[in-house]
């Protein structure tokens, strides 16, 4: 299974992302702000980073830029978590260095398919099938 860093300041979104990731066996690292997320990415070297765009203090796009400029973290895929759905937002997100994005509110299937695809690209050997979620 993969180690996934979730950088999200909204407690409900953090709880949901953690639940979904852990339900398929991933280990979740949590950060509530960009600065903590950058530090955890450098120290823990996760297989994937889920980065909220709208964070207090430094925003998620700035944090992604820092990670992509660092030789130690630039190869870690960063997926933006965003409620932004305006024209041009995807281009702005990708220009900042994000490898993809997931729109909020989170959809179980879309969320885990995106995670599985990006983990599989990295070659971690993590399980990439999406089991039925039993609640």
Task: Show the residue positions of the predicted features.
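Conserved acidic carboxylate
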Residues: 8, 32
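Short acidic/polar segment at the start of the alpha1 helix of CheY-like receiver
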Residues: 10-14
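Charged docking surfaces used in two-component/phosphorelay signaling
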Residues: 15-23
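Active-site residues of response regulator receiver
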Residues: 52, 82
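The feature encodes the CheY-like receiver
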Residues: 56-59, 74, 86, 104
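C-terminal output helix
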Residues: 106-115
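The C-terminal output helix
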Residues: 116-132
